[in-house]
From Swiss-Prot:
Residues binding phosphate, per UniProt: R86, G124, T125, R126
Protein name as catalogued: Ribonuclease PH
Lineage: Bacteria, Pseudomonadati, Pseudomonadota, Alphaproteobacteria, Hyphomicrobiales
Record-listed E.C. numbers: 2.7.7.56
Function (record text): Phosphorolytic 3'-5' exoribonuclease that plays an important role in tRNA 3'-end maturation. Removes nucleotide residues following the 3'-CCA terminus of tRNAs; can also add nucleotides to the ends of RNA molecules by using nucleoside diphosphates as substrates, but this may not be physiologically important. Probably plays a role in initiation of 16S rRNA degradation (leading to ribosome degradation) during starvation.
GO biological-process terms attached to the record: rRNA catabolic process; rRNA processing; tRNA processing
């Protein structure tokens, strides 16, 4: 039995609530069990300087954790002068994941910044961020189309992310903090609605895992992402 008492292939309770931020062009409050992330998408009329004249837009992301998102207060990274290596890795992952399903020329020479702020962390903050960020970005595109800023929907597909791991030899889906801490292996999968793999991050904590075990985790992740995509569809109507 896994620490959370869930079945090996069972997600935590996941909710996706759009339109929670009054001023953002798109927003979503995403929860994976006790992990809660606020995702907002903001339209900037100017794209990055290096894309000027290309006719192409850009989607990027920023990620942060509130000081008391964890058991003990963490110092705000702004007071340290720069984001940590972990923060930079995660926000780049979120940006890559979103761009994988966006037709960038359809945005025009504009930039959309998706901010993912962790309100409470209990494992899987990066996977929750990607899943909620897609909803926020979708809402931003809907807002833009409603005001004739763009004429076509730039979103080509869904994208969501989920963690998997091996706990006492058993593959499990959607690890919370306690499970992640005790897992023999943990991995994050970013997968599109059509089943395309955007990114895989996997680490053996105790002993190497086999190809067969990896494929088992992949199958588990694909099934989990299919459930998340269904929830995204429900959230955006």
């Amino acid at each position: 039995m896994r620490p959370s008492k869930r079945a090996p292939d069972e997600l935590r309770k996941v909710t996706l609530e759009k339109g929670v931020a009054r001023y953002a062009e798109g927003s979503c409050l995403v929860t994976f069990g006790e992990t809660k992330v606020l995702c907002t998408a903001s339209l900037e009329e100017r794209g990055p300087p290096w894309l000027r004249g290309s006719g192409k837009g850009w989607v990027t992301a920023e990620y942060a954790m509130l000081p008391r998102a964890t058991h003990e207060r963490n110092r705000r990274e702004v007071t340290a002068g720069k984001p940590s290596g972990r923060t930079q890795e995660i926000q780049r992952l979120i940006g890559r994941s979103l761009r994988a399903v966006v037709n960038l020329p359809a945005i025009g020479e504009r930039q959309i910044v998706v901010d993912c702020d962790v309100l409470q962390a209990d494992g899987g903050t990066r996977t929750a961020s990607i899943t909620g960020a897609w909803v926020a970005l979708h809402e931003c595109f809907t807002w833009m189309r409603g005001r004739s800023i763009i004429s076509v929907d730039p979103m080509r597909d869904h994208v969501a992310a989920i963690s998997c791991g091996i706990h006492k030899g058993i593959p499990i889906l959607d690890l919370d903090y306690d499970e992640d801490s005790a897992a023999d292996t943990d991995a994050n999968f970013v997968i599109t609605g059509s089943g395309g793999i955007v990114e895989v991050q996997g680490t053996a904590e105790i002993a190497p895992f086999s190809e067969e075990q990896f494929l088992g985790l992949l199958r588990l992740a694909k099934a989990g992402v299919a459930q998340l995509v269904a929830l995204q569809k429900q959230a955006v109507g």
